[in-house]
């Protein structure tokens, strides 16, 4: 059963602390210039799954596609921002199953991660995280009780930030952050999308949607498998 709770008042939105747009292959030569690195992802299809990987510090991370929906990411040195994972393009309201080993040391997320267009929105359904809870730095919009836990619904705004539509765009980030952390389970994305809509957070046309591991100026390792 899904239950919703919404707030009638909230604090001002702030820029999300960890936001990475369309995720860069670390075994390629790093491009010149930070902006180019930030807007040049590696994407494709691997074993029937869409994948996306992005980093602004190629020397600090290794991303590997495995069999089926499996992928792994190792990052170190407490440097840079890295996001990688597998899923689908386009995204949709689907139930996503996942399992694996997620071991962050510092600021990191394990999340269903995606984008929409018209409006341009970056979204996270955070299943696990390291030392920083992203809902603590965003405007609280409500709660959803589903899949054995309460998720905090929040929104933040990015100004002149890299996105799937260019390197200097203003857009909102939608968040559902699970209170009872886990590294395996299933995510009913449609329930989260409906909860966001009832909280006034509208999505557009789906671009890609992946189970992602993100690390920001931290270290860690993860091997995950996604299916749907």
UniProtKB/Swiss-Prot annotation:
Annotated metabolic or biological route of this protein: Glycan degradation; xylan degradation
Catalytic function, reaction form: Endohydrolysis of (1->4)-beta-D-xylosidic linkages in xylans
Keyword Transmembrane carried by entry: no
Pfam families assigned to the protein according to its UniProt record, in alphabetical order: Glyco_hydro_11
Keywords of the record: Carbohydrate metabolism, Glycosidase, Hydrolase, Polysaccharide degradation, Secreted, Signal, Virulence, Xylan degradation
Transmembrane regions: none
Major location (coarse): secreted
GO cellular component labels: extracellular region
Boundaries of every GH11 domain copy: 37-227
EC number(s) from the headed UniProt entry: 3.2.1.8
Disulfide-bonded cysteines: none
Dependence of activity on temperature: Optimum temperature is 40 degrees Celsius.
InterPro entries: ConA-like_dom_sf, GH11/12, GH11_AS_1, GH11_AS_2, GH11_dom, Glyco_hydro_11
Function summary: Endo-1,4-beta-xylanase involved in the hydrolysis of xylan, a major structural heterogeneous polysaccharide found in plant biomass representing the second most abundant polysaccharide in the biosphere, after cellulose. Plays an important role in causing fusarium head blight (FHB) on cereal crops. Induces cell death and hydrogen peroxide accumulation in infected wheat leaves.
Protein name: Endo-1,4-beta-xylanase B
The gene coding this protein: XYLB
